[in-house]
From Swiss-Prot:
EC number: 7.4.2.8
This protein's encoding gene: secA
Binding site for ATP: 87, 105-109, 512
Region described as Disordered: spans on this chain: 865-892
Descriptive protein name: Protein translocase subunit SecA
Listed InterPro entries: Helicase_ATP-bd, Helicase_C-like, P-loop_NTPase, SEC_C_motif, SecA, SecA_CS, SecA_DEAD, SecA_motor_DEAD
Cytoplasm found in the keyword field: yes
Binding positions for Zn(2+) per the UniProt entry: 895, 897, 906-907
Biological source species: Ectopseudomonas mendocina (strain ymp) (Pseudomonas mendocina)
GO cellular component labels: cell envelope Sec protein transport complex; cytosol; plasma membrane
Length: 911
C-alpha cells in the first residue's frame, strides 16, 4: 500500500543509485579543462603517477574521478570519441562490481574502457570477457590504441595459441578472451606439472560483455576437459537400428489414448520415458539382437549401461532435430546454441547422447570421453575478487544475478530518448497464416525503403522464411549457424534501405546495425582508398542514412516468442539505437512451441470463441499477458534448474578448491619430503590398525595378514612373528615404531643409492600423477552419484542432503587413497645403477627409438609431399639391436669402480 507512495517520494533504488553517481560525474566533468591542457606526454604520464599513488596507499575509489577524466581525454585524442555522462555512470557501475544494463548502441565497449583502465592501474590484471572470439579480437584491436597511448599493455587469449604467446597475453595489464577460453585455461592450469606451465595469475577483476548470455544462458553448460574412454560405437549403431521400431504413446489431456505406443515424450522437461510395454518390447529386441542374455532384465545392475544407451538413442530420435538443435557439417554433428543461434564446434553432449545422434545421422561415431577436469561458469566467475558485466537486457534477471552471483543490476539512462515503437503481438491460428502475414509485412516495409531484420528461433525456420522470400523474388541475406563466417559482413550492411536480413535468435549480437549501412566496412574493402573515395563513400552513406530515418528506421519482425523475455527484448533492441526511429512486431501462432507447450488452454478457447476466420489475427492485451505469464513460468523453471545445478556443483566446487589448492601447494613446494613422511606414517598406521586393532589383546592380532600387507603394499618382508617370539616386551606401540623404522630405513637406503634431489623430484611427480588420476576417477564417481541421487526421493530422503553426505564420504576416501597410492608407488620403486656398457646400450636404444619416432613423423610429412609434388618414396632406416660388450655386473657383486662396496650400494640410480 505504502510502496508506491515511498517510491514516488524517494525514487526507485535504481534512480537513487544513478543520482548518487551523478555527483561523481560532476567531479569528472570539473577536471575536463585541466586534462585538455595537458600534452600527450603529460596525459600518458598520469598512468605512472596513479600507480605511484596506489603504491603509497591511495585507493582506486580515490583515483576514480581523475582516472576517468584521463581515460575520457585519451578517448577523444585517440579514438575521436568522448564519453557521455551516462557512459561515465556505466563505468562507475562496472568499477563497483555491478551489472550495467545499457541499451543497444549506447557504446558498451567504450564504457568498459573506463573501469578497465582504472582497475588495470593496480597491476593485478583485468580480464575482458566476450561471447565469441571475433568480438574478443575486434574489441581488443579497437581499444588497443587507447590503452597503449595510456601506457598499458593488451593481450588476447585464443584457442590453440602457442604457450609463450598465451603466457604473454595473461601477463598483460588487460586481457581479452572468450568465457570458454578463460574457463578452460583455469582447468588447464590445474592440470599443469610445474608453475612455469601455468598461464593465469590471480583472478582479480573481470568485465563480462553480454553478461546475461554468459552467466545465465550458459550457466547450465559445464566446462569439461576430457580424455577418451572405451569405444562403444558398434553398440550405438546396433541400438540406433532398433529405436525406429518403437512407437510413441500419445494421450490427450482428458486421458484418452489416441495412439498406443512404447514411450511418452514430455516436451516441457525434454525427457522420454519407456512404459511397461516399451520395456518388454525393448528387452525382446535386445535379446533377439544378441545384446541381452536370454531371460535377463534390462534393469539388472550389469545391464544399466545398456539401458542408458537405449534412452540416449530414444532422446536422439525424439528430442533432437537436425537444423534445430544441431547441424551436420563435414561429417560431424555440431551443436547449435539455442540462445544465440551460433554453432558450438568442439562442444559435445554427455551421457552418450552425442554418440547416439552421430549414429542416427550415419556419421563417424567418436569415442566416449572421461572427464579429466570440470567446472561451471557459475563457479569459475565467482572466483574473481571483483566481477562486473554489461548487457542490453539484465533487469528481467536481476533477481538471479543477485541470488547467485551477488551482483546488483543498475539500469543506465540512455543518452537520447528511445524512439522505437513496439507494436502488440499478432496471434494467428496456424503457422502458415503467420508466415504469410510476415511476408506481407516485409513487402510493405521494403516498399517504404525501410531495412527489415527477421528474427527466428532455429535454422529450420530461417531457411523456411528464406524459401518463402525466394518464391516472392525478394532479395535477402540469411544469417545462421551455417553461414556464421559472413556474420559481420551481413550485419554491417543490414541497415541499408530495403535490406532484408534473416537471423537466428541473436546471431550478430555485439555488432550494431547502422542505419544506411556501415561506411567504414566499405572503406576497409578498398585496397588503398584515397581521400576522395572515402569522402564519396561518406556522402553516399549520409544520403542512405537520412533516407532510412525518414522511412521510419529499422523494422524488427520476430517469427515467434522465445522462452525468455530477455531474448525477445534483445531482438527488439536491435532497432532504435541511440535515439534512431524504429519499430518491432512479434508474429505468433497457436502452433508455436511456446504457445503449444506452455500457454494455457484459456487463450486457445478464447480465440476459438471469437470465431476467428482463416488469415485473421488477434491483437489483444489478454493474449500478450498470457504469453508473458507463460514466459515467466518457463524463466522460473529454468532459474530453478540453474539454482539446483549450482547447489549440486557447489558440493563438487568445495572439493575442487581443496584439490586445486593442494596441487598448487605441491607445485610451489621445492621439497615434498616432509609431506611424504607424514603420508608414510599415516598410511602405515592405518595398515597396522587393520590387523592389530588399537588397545587389543595379542590373541586378536592377525600377524600373518600384517606380514602379507607389508610385503604387498610397502615392499617390506619383515619376520614380525619371529620378533614377537624373540621379544616378550614387544607390544602394540613399540611394534608399530619398529615397523615404521624399518620402512624409513628401506626408503633412506634408496635415497643413498640415488641423489636426494632426484628422489625429491620423483616424489613430487608421483604425488601429482596419483592426485590427478584419482581426482579423474572421483569426478566420474561423483557424476554417477549425481545422476542417480534423485531416486532417494522415493525412499523419503532428501536427495540434496544425501548427495552432500555421500560425496563427503567419497572425498574423504579420495584423500586417503591419494596418501595410500603415493606411498605404495614410492615403496615399490626400484633404484639401480647401470654399468657403463649397459648405460651406453640403453642410451643407444633410446636414441634409436627416438629416431624411429622422428622417422615416422618425417615419413608422414613425406607422404603429404609425395601426394602434392610426386616426390619419390624415401627409404626407412632399420634399427640395429644393441650388442653388450661387457658382462653384466650383479647387484650384490663388488662395484667395478674399486670402492670395495657392493654394486647396489655404490653406483645406483632411480630406474
Amino acid at each position: 500500500m505504502f510502496a508506491p507512495l515511498l517510491k514516488k517520494l524517494f525514487g526507485s533504488k535504481n534512480e537513487r543509485e544513478v543520482k548518487r553517481m551523478l555527483k561523481a560525474v560532476q567531479s569528472v566533468n570539473a577536471l575536463e579543462e585541466q586534462m585538455i591542457a595537458l600534452s600527450d606526454e603529460q596525459l600518458r604520464g598520469k598512468t605512472e603517477e596513479f600507480k605511484a599513488r596506489l603504491a603509497k596507499g591511495e585507493t582506486l575509489d580515490q583515483l576514480l574521478a581523475e582516472a576517468f577524466a584521463v581515460a575520457r581525454e585519451a578517448g577523444k585524442r585517440v579514438m575521436g570519441m568522448r564519453h557521455f555522462d551516462v557512459q561515465l555512470i556505466g563505468g562507475m557501475t562496472l568499477h563497483e562490481g555491478k551489472i550495467a544494463e545499457m541499451r543497444t548502441g549506447e557504446g558498451k565497449t567504450l564504457v568498459g574502457t573506463l573501469a578497465v583502465y582504472l582497475n588495470a592501474l593496480s597491476g593485478k590484471g583485468v580480464h575482458v570477457v566476450t561471447v565469441n572470439e571475433y568480438l574478443a579480437r575486434r574489441d581488443a584491436n579497437w581499444m588497443r590504441p587507447l590503452y597503449e597511448f595510456l601506457g598499458l599493455t593488451v593481450g588476447i587469449v585464443t584457442p590453440f595459441q602457442p604457450p609463450e604467446e598465451k603466457r604473454a597475453a595473461y601477463a598483460a595489464d588487460i586481457t581479452y578472451g572468450t568465457n570458454n577460453e578463460f574457463g578452460f585455461d583455469y582447468l588447464r592450469d590445474n592440470m599443469a606439472f610445474s608453475l612455469e606451465d601455468k598461464f593465469q595469475r590471480e583472478l582479480n577483476f573481470a568485465v563480462i560483455d553480454e553478461v546475461d548470455s554468459i552467466l545465465i544462458d550458459e550457466a547450465r553448460t559445464p566446462l569439461i576437459i576430457s580424455g577418451q574412454a572405451e569405444d562403444s560405437s558398434k553398440l550405438y549403431t546396433e541400438i540406433n537400428r532398433l529405436i525406429p521400431r518403437l512407437k510413441q504413446h500419445i494421450e490427450e489431456e482428458e486421458g484418452v489414448v489416441t495412439q498406443e505406443g512404447h514411450y511418452k515424450v514430455d516436451e516441457k522437461s525434454r525427457q522420454v520415458e519407456l512404459n511397461e510395454a516399451g520395456h518388454q518390447y525393448v528387452e525382446e529386441m535386445l535379446t533377439a539382437a544378441g545384446l541381452l542374455a536370454e531371460g535377463e532384465s534390462l534393469y539388472s545392475a550389469h545391464n544399466l549401461g545398456l539401458l542408458t544407451h537405449v534412452y540416449a538413442g530414444l532422446r536422439a530420435h525424439t528430442l533432437f532435430n537436425r537444423n534445430v538443435e544441431y547441424i551436420v557439417q563435414n561429417g560431424q554433428v555440431i551443436l547449435i546454441d539455442e540462445h544465440t543461434g551460433r554453432t558450438m564446434p568442439g562442444r559435445r553432449l554427455s551421457e552418450g547422447l552425442h554418440q547416439a545422434i552421430e549414429a542416427k545421422e550415419g556419421v563417424n561415431i567418436q569415442a566416449e570421453s572421461q572427464t579429466l577436469a570440470s567446472t561451471t561458469f557459475q563457479n569459475y566467475f565467482r572466483l574473481y575478487n571483483k566481477l562486473s558485466g554489461m548487457t542490453g537486457t539484465a533487469d528481467t534477471e536481476a533477481f538471479e544475478f543477485r541470488q547467485i552471483y551477488g551482483l546488483d543490476v543498475v539500469v543506465i539512462p540512455t543518452n537520447k530518448p528511445i524512439a522505437r515503437k513496439d507494436f502488440n503481438d499478432l496471434v494467428y491460428l496456424t503457422q502458415e497464416e503467420k508466415y504469410q502475414a510476415i511476408i506481407t509485412d516485409i513487402k510493405d516495409c521494403q516498399a517504404q525503403g525501410r531495412p527489415i531484420l527477421v528474427g527466428t528461433a532455429s535454422i529450420e525456420t530461417s531457411e523456411y522464411v528464406s524459401q518463402l522470400l525466394q518464391k516472392e523474388k525478394i532479395e535477402h541475406k540469411v544469417l545462421n549457424a551455417k553461414y556464421h563466417d559472413k556474420e559481420a559482413e551481413i550485419i554491417a550492411q543490414a541497415g541499408r534501405p530495403g535490406a532484408v536480413t534473416i537471423a537466428t535468435n541473436m546471431a550478430g549480437r555485439g555488432t550494431d546495425i547502422l542505419l544506411g549501412g556501415n561506411w567504414e566496412v566499405e572503406v576497409a574493402a578498398l585496397e588503398n582508398p584515397t581521400d576522395e573515395q572515402i569522402a564519396q563513400i561518406k556522402t553516399e552513406w549520409q544520403k542512405r542514412h537520412q533516407q532510412v530515418i525518414e522511412a521510419g528506421g529499422l523494422h524488427v519482425i520476430a517469427s515467434e516468442r522465445h522462452e525468455s523475455r530477455r531474448i525477445d527484448n534483445q531482438l527488439r533492441g536491435r532497432a532504435g539505437r541511440q535515439g534512431d526511429p524504429g519499430s518491432s512486431r512479434f508474429y505468433l501462432s497457436l502452433e508455436d512451441n511456446l504457445m503449444r507447450i506452455f500457454a494455457s488452454d484459456r487463450v486457445k478457447n478464447f480465440m476459438k470463441a471469437l470465431g476467428m476466420q482463416s488469415g485473421e489475427a488477434i491483437e489483444h492485451r489478454m493474449v500478450t499477458n498470457a504469453i508473458e505469464k507463460a514466459q515467466r513460468k518457463v524463466e522460473g523453471r529454468n532459474f530453478d534448474m540453474r539454482k539446483q545445478l549450482l547447489e549440486f556443483d557447489d558440493v563438487a566446487n568445495e572439493q575442487r578448491k581443496v584439490i586445486y589448492h593442494m596441487r598448487n601447494s605441491l607445485l610451489a613446494a621445492e621439497n615434498v619430503g616432509d609431506t611424504i613422511a607424514e603420508f608414510r606414517e599415516e598410511v602405515l598406521t592405518a595398515a597396522i590398525n587393520g590387523h592389530i586393532p588399537p588397545q587389543s589383546m595379542p590373541e586378536q592380532w592377525d600377524v600373518a595378514g600384517l606380514e602379507s600387507t607389508l610385503q604387498s603394499d610397502f615392499g617390506l618382508k619383515l619376520p614380525i612373528q619371529q620378533w614377537l617370539d624373540e621379544d616378550d616386551k614387544l607390544y602394540e606401540e613399540t611394534l608399530r615404531e619398529r615397523i615404521l623404522a624399518e620402512l624409513v630405513a628401506a626408503y633412506n637406503e634408496k635415497e643413498t643409492q640415488a641423489s636426494a634431489e632426484a628422489l625429491r623430484t620423483f616424489e613430487k611427480q608421483i604425488l601429482l600423477r596419483v592426485l590427478d588420476d584419482l581426482w579423474k576417477d572421483h569426478l566420474s564417481t561423483m557424476d554417477h552419484l549425481r545422476h542417480g541421487i534423485h531416486l532417494r526421493g522415493y525412499a523419503q530422503k532428501n536427495p540434496k542432503q544425501e548427495y552432500k553426505r555421500e560425496s563427503f564420504a567419497l572425498f574423504q576416501e579420495l584423500l586417503e587413497s591419494i596418501k595410500r597410492d603415493t606411498i605404495r608407488v614410492l615403496s615399490h620403486v626400484q633404484v639401480r645403477r647401470e654399468d657403463p656398457a649397459e648405460e651406453e646400450a640403453r642410451l643407444r636404444r633410446e636414441a634409436e627409438a627416438l629416431a624411429e619416432r622422428m622417422q615416422f613423423q618425417h615419413a608422414e610429412a613425406s607422404a603429404l609431399a609425395a601426394e602434392q609434388d610426386g616426390a619419390e618414396e624415401g627409404a626407412v632406416a632399420t634399427a640395429t639391436a644393441p650388442v653388450r660388450s661387457e658382462n653384466k655386473v650383479g647387484r650384490n657383486e663388488p662395484c667395478p669402480c674399486g670402492s670395495g662396496k657392493k654394486y647396489k650400494h655404490c653406483h645406483g640410480q632411480i630406474n
